[in-house]
Design a protein with these regions (language model features):
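Conserved acidic donor-binding segment of nucleotide-sugar-dependent glycosyltransferases
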Residues: 339-340, 344-351, 360-366
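Donor nucleotide-sugar binding/catalytic pocket of nucleotide-sugar-dependent glycosyltransferases
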Residues: 48, 136-139, 154-212, 219, ...
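Short alpha-helical donor nucleotide-sugar binding micro-motif in glycosyltransferases
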Residues: 286-287, 294-299
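Aromatic "clamp/platform" in nucleotide-sugar-dependent glycosyltransferases that forms part
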Residues: 307
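Glycosyltransferase donor-sugar binding loop
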Residues: 36, 228-231, 256-269
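Conserved donor-binding/catalytic core segment of Leloir-type glycosyltransferases
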Residues: 168, 195, 211-236, 242-245, ...
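Short hydrophobic beta-strand element within catalytic cores of glycosyltransferases
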Residues: 324-327
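Nucleotide-activated donor-binding/catalytic signature segment of Leloir-type glycosyltransferases, i.e.
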Residues: 269-287
Length: 411
């Protein structure tokens, strides 16, 4: 089968999905909505920077990506303003790229088009001719946050979900929300991790091969809390995370905090200075996957204070490596976390609640140990890569075999 993926080619999630699809013996053409380096496994790579993606409007880290230029530094400083502008100007850019996308479809003749999120990849993919089925993956904040960004975002989200022949998400909540937004309930839907599953063997093997050390960056022999989420406006409440740190240090002065994707970020530097956190925190850049996994193994606790989210791949990787999760109390993460059993859920707007949960976890090593065993079993039961690939294959074959005409409803 020839599958045309529409995704951010810089993203580790995209690259893992490509590897999974290629492992299923399918041909992959990638349309990247961001400029990116070569992607292993694809037969062809085309870049269509919709919504001014060339300026770097989202955060991902991948080896070989272009270094941030002045425009990306400005985006970092004025991230919220830039995001708001994209909600109004981004949809207009689709008018320019739609014709180019349809020409590419006519040229490569894929059997199936799959967009790895709704804005703006799914919106572009919705321009696929009706004779070709399309699958759309929902990310956790696509419907609860981005779709409400402007009237144009709402209209294009509705159009995308009505056009979609199949829907994927990493949480059952998002399939339900997708149906409320116009996806037909009788069409195929699949809940699987967005990164095509967790390969425990690969994680162990690549960690063993990775030679770079944290010895000069992080203190040894102290409790460690890791926040790997970077800055995601409107989704992750890093303001709450930083405000909780002094509250933890009052009771646990030896705890050390590590944040990836925050090195040099003005917002992070401002919080560190204002809250006098120097010596208690390390702001790291985005890390290669093996190094991130090694950090998870070294850390005691994984923190993600999400207000809008699905099931973050970093969450699955963190619990697979033994981290105890302390995460926002949102519906998608309730599908994974039993409070006091294998993690804690906290109100995402309350620094004191987060601090209390961190202190309780750090005071209970048996809780952390038992949770690590439970979470590893959860990964094996619900997110193991081989099992997920088999589910993806069945889903793709069902879409391609049914024919788009029988699956498409006129908006």
């Amino acid at each position: 089968m020839h599958i045309l993926l529409v995704a951010d080619g810089r993203s580790p999630i995209t690259r893992r999905w490509v590897r999974a699809v290629v492992a299923l013996q399918h041909q992959v053409t990638l349309v990247s909505t961001f400029p990116c380096s070569a992607v292993d496994g694809v037969s062809a790579l085309h870049v269509m920077p919709v919504a001014f993606a060339g300026m770097g409007g989202s955060q991902v880290g991948v080896a070989g990506a272009p270094s941030p230029g002045r425009s990306r530094q400005l985006v970092s400083r004025f991230r919220s303003v830039f995001l708001s502008a994209r909600y109004y100007l981004g949809p207009l850019s689709l008018l320019f790229f739609a014709r180019r996308f349809r020409r590419l479809i006519a040229e490569v003749k894929p059997d199936l088009v799959h967009a790895l999120r709704i804005p703006f990849e799914g919106m572009l993919a919705s321009q696929t001719p009706a004779s070709i089925p399309i699958a759309v993956t929902i990310w956790g904040n696509d419907l609860t946050y981005h779709a409400l960004g402007s009237p144009w975002m709402k209209a294009l989200t509705l159009m995308t979900l009505r056009r979609a022949n199949g829907l994927l998400a990493d949480a059952h909540r998002d399939i339900r929300l997708g149906q409320l937004w116009g996806f037909a309930a009788e069409r195929p839907a699949l809940v699987v991790p967005g990164g095509a599953g967790i390969d425990l063997g690969e994680m162990h093997r690549l960690r063993a091969q990775f030679v770079e050390s944290f010895a000069d960056l992080l203190p040894a022999g102290v409790p460690m809390v890791v926040n790997p989420r970077g800055f995601r406006p409107g989704s992750v409440r890093n303001d709450v995370f930083f405000q909780a740190i002094p509250l933890v240090l009052e009771r646990k002065p030896k705890v050390f905090f590590v944040c990836t994707g925050m090195a040099g970020q003005p917002e992070a530097l401002r919080w560190v200075q204002e809250l006098k956190l120097e010596g208690h925190i390390r702001l790291l850049p985005f890390l290669p996957q093996p190094q991130l996994w090694d950090l998870f193994v070294r850390a005691n606790i994984f923190v993600s204070v999400s207000a809008h989210d699905g099931t973050p791949n970093s969450f699955l990787e963190g619990i697979a490596c033994g981290c105890f999760p302390v995460v926002g109390d949102i519906e998608s993460l309730r599908e994974w976390v039993t409070p006091g059993g294998n993690g804690f859920l906290v109100e995402p707007h309350k620094p004191q609640a987060l601090a209390d949960a961190l202190v309780v976890a750090l005071d209970n090593p048996d809780l952390l140990s038992n949770a690590a065993e439970k979470n590893l079993q959860l990964i094996r039961q619900r997110a193991e890569a081989g099992m997920v690939r088999a589910q993806i294959e069945i889903f793709y074959q069902r879409l391609a075999g049914s024919g788009a005409a029988s699956l498409t409803t006129t908006p």
